[in-house]
Amino acid sequence: MSCSFQLSLVPSPPNLKMSIRNIINDPFATGSLSLAAMSWIITFISSIVADVQGSFPKLTWWGIVFELFVILFLAVLYIVDDIQPHRLSIVGFLAIATVYTTNSANSLVYSNTSAKNCAAAGSILLSMINLIWLFYYGTDIANSVLVARVFGKQGSNPFTTPQPNRTYTPNDINNTNTNYMSSGQLTGLEKGVDSNAYGNHDDSDDELSADDHYPITVRALYNYDANPEDINELSLKQGEVFKVKDTAGKWWQAKKQSGELGICPSNYVETLH
């Protein structure tokens, strides 16, 4: 018994969900990676033509190759759903790539040949995309949300410890077909409430196990102190494993191993299976 108890305290490593849908389902990733790929192709083809026509800055070629590496690196991280742990590396690579693309744009934009001017335009586009990525991956959650909304996404986990959005609604906590749970329902301390207030009681529900009601296992990515003004919120410890009812909205209805019920911010946890 003691052995199994100790093992339960050690969080298992996260499962990598390799799928191209991780990009397709993320509007920010889809838009920015597509634009970056098109800009890179423009720069690459124009640079080949310019090099054939005459002298071409040698350092620009290294910048083009490095930018391709950055784009592929980001795409792979999205495919394996592993962006969060690599944000610091992403920011470092983007800073280097931005230096190369801006230098290439400065070297080519004043040329009198159309091929070099086209390559300069591609380099300028890549520089702009790199700056957007730097802003998105290198700042806190509030700024990341502002950038993501340009592409139609409502937020993403930042590298720094995120701050949950406290303006949640009942639909953020439960499915649209589920009534919002009051504080008393979550704690089990509500008094004087008719058992039929939330629909007819079905005794068969009592026979369901906790795993039936909370089928999704998650793990806390960061420590989180619940808002003392909201008794619904749960405090989390980094690495803590517990169950959630579903993954809809920004706040998930959860049940800890101690049996405590409440809600937790979705950007503080990751699903395990």
Curated annotation (Swiss-Prot):
Keywords on record: Cell membrane, Glycoprotein, Membrane, SH3 domain, Stress response, Transmembrane, Transmembrane helix
Positions of glycan attachment: 112
The UniProt record lists the keyword Zinc: no
Membrane topology: Multi-pass membrane protein
Topological domain ranges for the Extracellular compartment: 49-59, 111-117
Cytoplasmic side: 1-27, 81-89, 139-273
Localisation per UniProt entry: Cell membrane
Keyword Transcription regulation: no
Domain SH3: 213-273
GO terms, biological process: regulation of actin filament polymerization
GO cellular component: plasma membrane
Listed Pfam families: SH3_1
Transmembrane region(s): 28-48, 60-80, 90-110, 118-138
Record text on subunit structure and interactions: Forms homooligomers.
Function, as annotated: Plasma membrane osmosensor that activates the high osmolarity glycerol (HOG) MAPK signaling pathway in response to high osmolarity.
Family of this protein: Belongs to the SHO1 family.
Protein name: High osmolarity signaling protein SHO1
Native source organism of the sequence: Komagataella phaffii (strain GS115 / ATCC 20864) (Yeast)
Organism lineage: Eukaryota, Fungi, Dikarya, Ascomycota, Saccharomycotina
